[in-house]
Design a protein with these regions (language model features):
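C-terminal catalytic/acceptor-binding lobe
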Residues: 12-16, 20, 164-250
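Short acidic, S/G/P-rich loop/turn micro-motifs used as interaction or catalytic elements
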Residues: 10-17, 46-48, 111-115, 126, ...
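Active-site-proximal specificity loops/subdomain of glycosyltransferases
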Residues: 42-102
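Short loop->beta transition adjacent to catalytic acidic/histidine clusters or analogous donor-positioning motifs
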Residues: 3-5, 28-41, 61-62
Length: 250
């Protein structure tokens, strides 16, 4: 079994963006699936199950695990909170039963993209170095003085079993900020490999170049196509030409 589980959480409002992300993965892999990573496609309870989305993901990942959330919450933040908590409980159940055996889980949304072809290996190396329960992009704001790590992050598969307060989610605050003090107590690490550009649009190429130079391999938060466009120019096109474009350091 692969060491990393990539989780893409989807509700009906971002099916189109999720499909574009899956298409980008297919273009990056170009017929040769990623190594060391499986995919889990998590639908909110009321979300349709698009055939194209699953077919595209299956081109990039040797294993795709569709899962429909059992929670009924809708709206923000209750909807995504319920999906994440239910998904993580399912992941823990599958590991407790020994059916799965991943080292870590990358929980993501439709506005998260890889900036390099070997992102699974780079994230696994970062996870090994971090030696923590949560690893991702830290922000100083949130519900608690410790700030929070954005929810597009790496988690131990058994995270929700480590503290009884992780068994449910708030309906008034996003889960990653609401539960931040617990994650901090359990152990978290701010890693450069995962970065967040919150609600960003029209991002210029030099921003992605700088992120890559600073070791970012996974980016969340860009709400338009500019991140995907950059990946197509700098990863997909470069692979077809037989080389990679890397920004100069210094």
């Amino acid at each position: 079994m692969s060491r990393l589980l990539y989780v893409l959480q989807v509700w009906h409002g971002d099916v189109d963006m999720a499909t574009e992300v899956a298409r980008l993965h297919a273009e990056i892999t170009d017929g040769t699936p990623y190594q060391d990573v499986d995919a889990m496609l998590v639908y909110r309870r009321d979300c349709p199950r698009p055939k194209e989305l699953e077919e595209l993901l299956s081109k990039s990942f040797s294993v795709v695990r569709p899962y429909r959330s059992r929670r009924h919450e809708t709206g923000f933040p209750a909807g995504p909170n319920g999906v994440w908590c239910d998904m993580m409980q399912h992941v823990a159940t599958m590991h407790r039963s020994k059916e799965w055996n991943y080292d870590c889980v990358l929980t993501t949304e439709a506005d998260a993209v890889p900036l390099v072809r070997d992102w699974p290996q780079r994230l696994l190396a970062a996870w090994d170095r971090a030696d923590s329960i949560v690893a991702g992009c830290w922000h100083p704001n949130g519900e608690h003085a410790v700030g929070h790590i954005n929810g597009n992050a790496l988690f131990d598969p058994m995270t929700v079993t480590l503290d009884p307060r992780l068994s449910g989610c708030s309906t008034r605050a996003a889960w990653d900020t609401y539960l931040a003090n617990i994650f901090h107590q359990l152990g978290w690490e701010d890693i450069p490999e995962i970065r967040n550009l919150y609600q960003a649009r029209n991002v210029e190429s030099f921003v992605f170049d700088h992120l890559l130079r600073d070791d970012c391999v996974w980016l969340h938060g860009v709400k338009d196509s500019t991140a995907r466009d950059w990946v197509r120019r700098n990863v997909v096109s470069s692979q077809k030409k037989g080389f990679f474009i890397l920004p100069q350091r210094g």
